[in-house]
């Protein structure tokens, strides 16, 4: 039913032809979303790509966080990733020139209207627990910084490599 679908537009124009319906109860490529007894379990599932964030995943996360926020049965969210090598290696730069990346581009937009990866960016007021097992780089910090509780395994590493690739970490909420 419509209650299971979250409508979102990567371009923020909110017109019908620009809308993408994402059914949060159906499998999504790159992220798993499961609900158990009031717990929203969110798992980044792109281990072959270092659990990096593909441009199309921004709409998925927006739909997931909207469901967490608006579903009265959800009391807490837990976000983690598959494997123990990478929690999240940030934005998948190999997809930076894709059509999905062009749709998600945030040029000429206020940050608040451009980036929707994390709970804070989606106005989630419920508690969020972030479980980090492995390396967290760049955009992966969105989830860590916005969590109420962070549980890091002994092999967790937190890296901001923006300077190494000639970028400024202007998007991540580090600080």
Give short role names for the model-derived ranges.
Residues 1-18:
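N-terminal amphipathic/basic-hydrophobic helices that include classical n-h-c signal peptides
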Residues 14, 18-84:
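Conserved CoA-thioester-binding segment of acyl-CoA-metabolizing enzymes
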Residues 20, 66-69, 93-133:
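An acidic, glycine-rich surface segment that forms the CoA-thioester-binding/catalytic face
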Residues 23-26, 59-60, 108-114, 168:
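Short gly/ser/thr-rich secondary-structure transition/capping motifs
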Residues 42, 79, 92, 143-145:
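Hydrophobic/aromatic residues within transmembrane alpha-helices
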Residues 84-88, 137:
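Short, active-site-adjacent cap segments at secondary-structure transitions
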Residues 115-125, 131, 137-175:
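CoA-thioester-processing core
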């Amino acid at each position: 039913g419509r209650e299971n679908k979250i409508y979102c537009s990567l371009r923020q124009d909110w017109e019908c032809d620009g809308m993408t319906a994402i059914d949060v109860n159906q499998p999504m490529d790159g992220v798993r979303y499961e609900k158990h007894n009031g717990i929203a379990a969110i798992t980044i599932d792109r281990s072959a790509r270092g659990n990096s964030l593909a441009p199309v995943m921004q709409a998925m996360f927006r739909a997931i966080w909207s469901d967490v926020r608006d579903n009265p049965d959800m009391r807490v969210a837990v976000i983690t990733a598959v494997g123990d090598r990478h929690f999240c290696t940030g934005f998948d730069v190999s997809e930076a020139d894709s059509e999905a990346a062009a749709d998600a581009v945030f040029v000429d937009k206020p940050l608040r209207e451009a980036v929707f990866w994390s709970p804070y960016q989606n106005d989630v007021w419920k508690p969020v627990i972030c479980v980090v097992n492995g390396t967290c780089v760049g955009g992966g910090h969105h989830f860590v910084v916005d969590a109420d509780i962070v549980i890091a395994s002994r092999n967790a590493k937190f890296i901001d490599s923006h300077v190494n690739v000639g970028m400024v970490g202007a998007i991540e909420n580090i600080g």
